[in-house]
Amino acid sequence: MKDQKVIVALDYDNQADALTFVDKIDPSSCRLKVGKEMFTLFGPEFVKELHKRGFSVFLDLKFHDIPNTCSKAVRAAAEMGVWMVNVHASGGERMMSASREILEPYGSDRPLLIGVTVLTSMEQQDLAGIGLDIAPQEQVKRLAALTKNSGLDGVVCSAQEASMLKADLGKEFQLVTPGIRPAGADVGDQKRIMTPVDAITAGSDYLVIGRPITQAENPSQVLNEINLSLASVL
C-alpha cells in the first residue's frame, strides 16, 4: 500500500457524525487523527471502529508526564494497534527515551513515536508568557534535536520549519505538519500555515488537515484533489 501523506484530523463531539464522515472516504486516500476530545468522549472502542474500516490511526494525545507514566501510556497506544502516537518533547530526554524503549518488543509493528515541539498556535509572545525568551523557530530546533537524540522517529512541526529540520536532522527524521490548508481554504486558528504541495516540497512527510476536508460537501473529492496535487511533487 502506498504511503498516504494526508492525515485527516477528526474533530467531532458526536461519534455517529464522525463515523458518517469516515464512511464517505477511502482508507487508501488518507490516515486519520484522533485527538484528546474524541478519545476522552469515545475511548479505545472508537479507534477500533476506525481500524475495522481499514484506517491507520494517529493517536494525538501528546503525552507529557514522568518517564514511567508516559512510557506506559505509549505502550497502551501500541497495544491498541495505532500507527502513530506522540509525546511532548518538552517532557525531556529521559521521558522520550523511556517511551521509545518500551516499544522495542513490538518490532516492526510498533507505532511511529513522534515528539511535539512548539504548538502551531504559539507565537513568540506566547513563549515569553511561559518563561521562554526564545523565538518559536529556535525552540523548535532545540526540541527537535532533543527528540532525535532520544531515539524518536520524528516531530510535529510547522511547515515553515520543515526544510531547516530536514537539513539539520536528516531525511529519515519524519516531519508531521499541522496547519495545512489547501489553497483558498479558511486559515482558522492556526498561526503558521502552508498549502499541501508547499509543505511536501519544504520537507514535510505527513500533512494534518482537518476542517477543509471534514467540513467539505464532498470530502472524498477534496482528498482526491489534494493527493493528485501531491503526486506531482512526490
UniProtKB/Swiss-Prot annotation:
Chain residues that bind substrate: 11, 33, 60-69, 120, 181, 190, 210-211
GO MF annotations, alphabetized: orotidine-5'-phosphate decarboxylase activity
Pathway given in the UniProt record: Pyrimidine metabolism; UMP biosynthesis via de novo pathway; UMP from orotate: step 2/2
Entry-linked PROSITE patterns: OMPDECASE
Gene: pyrF
InterPro entries linked to this entry: Aldolase_TIM, OMPdecase, OMPdecase_AS, OMPdecase_bac, OMPdeCOase_dom, RibuloseP-bd_barrel
Stated name of the protein: Orotidine 5'-phosphate decarboxylase
Enzyme Commission number: 4.1.1.23
SMART domains: OMPdecase (SM00934)
Keywords: Decarboxylase, Lyase, Pyrimidine biosynthesis
Native source organism of the sequence: Aliivibrio fischeri (strain ATCC 700601 / ES114)
Family label: Belongs to the OMP decarboxylase family. Type 1 subfamily.
UniProt subunit comment: Homodimer.
Catalyzed reactions: orotidine 5'-phosphate + H(+) = UMP + CO2
Enzyme class, broadest EC rank: lyase
Active site (record annotation): K62 (proton donor)
Gene Ontology cellular-component terms listed: cytosol
An example Gene Ontology biological process: 'de novo' pyrimidine nucleobase biosynthetic process
HAMAP family, per database record: OMPdecase_type1_B
ATP-binding found in the keyword field: no
Function: Catalyzes the decarboxylation of orotidine 5'-monophosphate (OMP) to uridine 5'-monophosphate (UMP).
